Curated annotation (Swiss-Prot):
Protein name: Phylloseptin-N3
Species assigned in the record: Pithecopus nordestinus
PTM sites of type Phenylalanine amide: F19
SS bonds (residue pairs): none
Alphabetically ordered keywords of this record: Amidation, Amphibian defense peptide, Antibiotic, Antimicrobial, Secreted
Length: 19
């Protein structure tokens, strides 16, 4: 599960760049 956290953060960061 912990290995998914960086992926989730990366996805949120990518979305934040669009907004």
């Amino acid at each position: 599960f912990l290995s998914l956290i960086p992926t989730a953060i990366n996805a949120v960061s990518a979305l934040a760049k669009h907004f």
